[in-house]
Amino acid sequence: MNIIDLGLIDFDEAYSIQERLAAEVFAGSGAETLLLLEHPPVYTIGSGGDEGNILDTAIEVRRINRGGDVTYHGPGQLVGYPVIDLARRGCDLHRYLRFIEELLMLVVADFRVAAFRSPGRTGVWTDQGKLASIGVGVRRWVTMHGFALNVTTDLTPFTRINPCGMAGCPVTSLEAEVGGNVKMIEVKARVGARFEGFLDEFMPLRDSEKDRGF
């Protein structure tokens, strides 16, 4: 498992890196990889999302091949793009989504934040609102895209969309939950330290692959 910190990187550039890594994983020539990064301000909308949920187009918009509706990415938000071979981990997308939720809940618990899943809604929540968004794309059982955890994010751009298609959805950040300064480098380190071991526990590698399909 490779864990790569890309720092602050343009969305399109990060997407190209994901595509290359996914092709290598599918071909068997590359390792599973977790990309950790931040984006300049951008709205992304899933393949089945409604552009009517974007109320202000002053920020760039990208329609992408993931599940979910519209969300915001910007500085202070930890974005994780795992490129994972689900064909070797049971071909269970729903369990993979639960893995990401559980991982993020463990990470924020390190900062004494009690987070939870909301029935029927993908993501990580607190009593104050949505703390992390999750949207995954899968092709031939190799994953792209992933999660966006609000750490020190300016939450104002969320007021100009219906986050994940939900009008009036409250959004929060780790900094707001803690009530003080949170360092991005510490959050990245905790995600990176937990990711591989927890994935292997949650979705162990298997010797054989199921039919990937297309």
UniProtKB/Swiss-Prot annotation:
This is Octanoyltransferase. HAMAP family: LipB. It is an enzyme of class 2 (transferase). The active site is at 164 (acyl-thioester intermediate). The keyword Glycoprotein does not apply. Its EC number is 2.3.1.181. Pathway: Protein modification; protein lipoylation via endogenous pathway; protein N(6)-(lipoyl)lysine from octanoyl-[acyl-carrier-protein]: step 1/2. GO terms for biological process: protein modification process. It comes from Geotalea uraniireducens (strain Rf4).
